[in-house]
Amino acid sequence: MKKQDFEFLINLLRQNAGWEFDEEQYFIIDKKISNFIREKSYPSVEDLVAELKVGSRALIAQVVESMAFSDTSFCRDYDVYEQFKDVLLPRIIDNNRSGKKLRFWSLGCSTGQEAYSVAFALKKKLIGIENWDIHVLGTDISSLAIAKAQKGLYNNFEVQMGLNANSILEFFISEGEHWRITPDIYELVEFRRYNMLDRLTTNVQYDVIICRNVLRYFAPEYQEQILARISQVQTPNGILYLGKNEQVSVIDKFYERINGFDCAYMCKNVGLDRPRLHDISTTSGSESLAMPSFVRPNMLSEKRPFAAEAFKAGVFKK
C-alpha cells in the first residue's frame, strides 16, 4: 500500500470512528484493507481509495466496519470477571433493592461474548432478585458483529475461550458443532449498532458500563468526549470497567479508581443537572443510540421444546 493511501485511510478512520493509528500499525491496516478489497473484488487499494474520495457514505461505513477490532472472549480476564461477579455485583444488587432494577451496558461488545458474560454472572446471583427488571445492552460499531451477537450462536473454539465444560453446559445448548445461548440468558440481553462518536440521547441510567480495551484505540480528544457522554448516563456512583492495564489519561475527569478492584472506576457524575431526553427503549428514527429494536431470531424450534416455556414465564422484563 502506498504511503498516501495509508495516510488517507487512517484519516478516514479517525474522522468516522475516532480511532488513532500511526505508521507502526501499518501492517494492521494493510492486512484488514487487503481482506476488504479481496472480499469486495476491488482491483487494488488505489481503486478503493479513489472511490472513497468521491464520498460514498455507504462505502465509508463498510470500510470503517471492516477495520473494527473483534478480539473478545467469554469471561475475559478471569480474575477481573470473578471479582466483578463475586464482590462488586452483590454490592450493586444490595444498593438497588428498593428500585429492583439493574442496567448494564457493554460498550464495544464485538460479537457479544462480554455482554453474555454479564448475564452469566447475573444468573448466578438471581436468588432473591428473580422478579427484578434486569437488562444488559451490548453495542458495537460493526453491524456484522452485532448480527452474530444477536444470534447467540458460537462454535466450539469460541465457547472454550474463557469457559469450562460445566459453564458451557449450563449456559448453552448444543446444536451440532455450535452452541446456542440458553433462552433465560438470551432474554436478558439486547444488541444494537452504535458508533461511539455519535450523540447519545437516553434517560436510561446504567449501574455498570463495560468498555474494556476499546478507548485505547481512540485519539485523546475522542476519549474525553466518550467518557463525558457515558458518565452522563450512569447512576450515582455507577461503575465503569476498562481493560486490564488499559491507560486512559483523561479518566480522572469523570471517574475515580475503586481501591482494591482491577479496572473498576466509580463515576463522579459531573453535571447531573443536565436535561433528560428520550428513553432508549421507546425512541426511534433518531441519529442517536435510540434505534428501533431488532427482530430476534426464532428460538422456539422443534429441537428445543422446553424453550417455549422459558419464554412464556416472562421472568425478566425489558
Task: Give the location of each predicted region.
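Core SAM-dependent methyltransferase catalytic element
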Residues: K253-K317
